[in-house]
């Protein structure tokens, strides 16, 4: 019986992780869950459904509200009111991540996942990582803290890489091929995207995801983050990772070996498969998701990425080459811009333009003594430097958005 802690349990990946566990209660026990606290009702339902002993909520004042929700839901279902240990505050998920477990699934959105990721690794627990941002911004701080095999990716693309890489030696790899659906605006030119709305950007063609990752997929920022994640996870040079557009989202990624062979992982788009692998790696769980239907004619297509229209991937590659605090600024500026875009304060194209402007400023070498503004390289990277760069990147992006982009 594996004990599992789920961070970000009320989000898309968190709820699907519980779904995977629900039909396998003889194999997995949920030892704790965490959430931001905006959906206390769902959190209470999860606690009751899975008899969860510990829950962490980022919102300081959530404890009483959660206890009331537990009483109401338990009463309506004729159940005894549970009395879990409730941790609250910004460090609650980090405290939970350090508790005894076999697997911690980090499904928190954004840079807030960094401290829980480091706490999980320090505890020696297997990390099923859906929070790519913590690896991207933490960089070598995360990879150096991890034992061999301790991080198991939950992103479908990186799970695909892990599976494909078992088909050859690491020294035999020529390149990684990272697939992208192309998002809702595939095939459109830059000028046609000037007036698209957040509602349009939320209409992903193949995946049902949370707000931030869906907007990131429309700008291709998500693919840029995945590029950085792949380089760090598998110690592959950024220039040996190619991004190709595959609209059907069936081939989740590929590995090309030095003899010319390419191994691909294919399955219908369903996050339950990489989640199940994240919980059970290197073993597979039977019937984790439906397989491909080979009884009907089908077509898989691949096309090059339009970097002129969607410049986020090359921006991410630039940040990755600079390393150190640059990826943290790339991610922070994006998160700030996504908030502004969803609030209607900036246009769609302003997202990547603002990221570029803020990243340029961070890497320019100007004598800016503002905490976090100046680039720190890998050789001097610390957690404080990453957090300062993250905070500066958010503030600076918000300032640029407020007064308009000047490049």
Curated annotation (Swiss-Prot):
EC number: 1.1.1.267
Binding site for 1-deoxy-D-xylulose 5-phosphate: 132, 156-157, 181, 204, 217, 222-223, 226
MF (Gene Ontology): 1-deoxy-D-xylulose-5-phosphate reductoisomerase activity; manganese ion binding; NADPH binding
Amino acids binding Mn(2+): 155, 157, 226
Enzyme class per UniProt: oxidoreductase
Pfam families per the UniProt record, alphabetical: DXP_redisom_C, DXP_reductoisom, DXPR_C
Organism (species): Cutibacterium acnes (strain DSM 16379 / KPA171202) (Propionibacterium acnes)
Cofactor(s), by name: Mg(2+); Mn(2+)
Annotated metabolic or biological route of this protein: Isoprenoid biosynthesis; isopentenyl diphosphate biosynthesis via DXP pathway; isopentenyl diphosphate from 1-deoxy-D-xylulose 5-phosphate: step 1/6
Biological process annotations from GO: isopentenyl diphosphate biosynthetic process, methylerythritol 4-phosphate pathway involved in terpenoid biosynthetic process
Binding site for NADPH: 10-13, 36, 131, 133, 210
Alphabetically ordered keywords of this record: Isoprene biosynthesis, Manganese, Metal-binding, NADP, Oxidoreductase
Reaction(s) the record says it catalyses: 2-C-methyl-D-erythritol 4-phosphate + NADP(+) = 1-deoxy-D-xylulose 5-phosphate + NADPH + H(+)
Domain of life: Bacteria
Protein task: Catalyzes the NADPH-dependent rearrangement and reduction of 1-deoxy-D-xylulose-5-phosphate (DXP) to 2-C-methyl-D-erythritol 4-phosphate (MEP).
Gene name for this UniProt entry: dxr
Name used for this protein in its record: 1-deoxy-D-xylulose 5-phosphate reductoisomerase
Assigned protein family: Belongs to the DXR family.
């Amino acid at each position: 019986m594996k004990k599992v802690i789920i961070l970000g349990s009320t989000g898309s990946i968190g709820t699907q992780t519980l779904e995977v566990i629900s039909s396998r209660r003889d194999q997995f026990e949920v030892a704790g869950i965490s959430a931001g606290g905006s959906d206390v009702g769902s959190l209470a339902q999860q606690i009751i459904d899975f008899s969860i002993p510990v829950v962490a909520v980022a919102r300081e004042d959530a404890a009483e509200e959660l206890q009331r929700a537990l009483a109401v839901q338990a009463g309506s279902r004729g159940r005894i009111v549970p009395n879990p240990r409730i941790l609250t505050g910004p460090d609650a998920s980090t405290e939970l991540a350090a508790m005894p477990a076999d697997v911690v699934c980090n499904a928190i959105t954004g840079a807030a996942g960094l401290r829980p990721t480091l706490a999980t690794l320090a505890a020696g627990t297997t990390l099923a990582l859906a929070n790519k941002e913590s690896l991207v911004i933490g960089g070598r701080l995360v990879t150096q803290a991890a034992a061999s095999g301790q991080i198991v990716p939950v992103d479908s693309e990186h799970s695909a890489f892990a599976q494909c890489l078992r088909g050859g030696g690491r020294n035999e790899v020529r390149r990684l091929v990272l697939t992208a659906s192309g998002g809702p605006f595939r095939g459109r030119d830059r000028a046609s995207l000037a007036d698209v709305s957040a509602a349009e950007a939320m209409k992903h063609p193949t995946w049902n995801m949370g707000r931030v990752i869906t907007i990131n997929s429309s700008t291709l920022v998500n693919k840029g983050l995945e590029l950085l994640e792949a380089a760090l996870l598998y110690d592959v040079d950024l220039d040996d990772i190619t991004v190709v557009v595959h609209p059907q989202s069936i081939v989740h990624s590929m590995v090309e070996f030095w003899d010319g062979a390419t191994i691909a992982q294919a399955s219908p788009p369903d996050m339950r498969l990489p989640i199940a692998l994240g919980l059970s790696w290197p073993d597979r769980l039977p019937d984790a998701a439906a397989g491909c239907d080979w009884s009907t004619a089908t077509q898989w297509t691949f096309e090059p990425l339009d970097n002129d229209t969607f410049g986020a991937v090359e921006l991410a590659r630039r940040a990755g080459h600079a390393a150190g605090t640059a990826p943290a600024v790339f991610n922070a500026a994006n998160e700030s811009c996504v908030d502004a875009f969803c609030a209607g304060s900036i246009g769609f194209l302003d997202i990547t333009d603002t990221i570029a402007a803020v990243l340029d400023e961070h890497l320019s070498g100007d004598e800016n003594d503002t905490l976090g503004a100046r680039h720190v390289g890998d050789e001097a990277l610390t957690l404080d430097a990453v957090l300062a760069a993250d905070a500066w990147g958010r503030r600076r992006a918000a300032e640029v958005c407020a007064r308009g982009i000047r490049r």
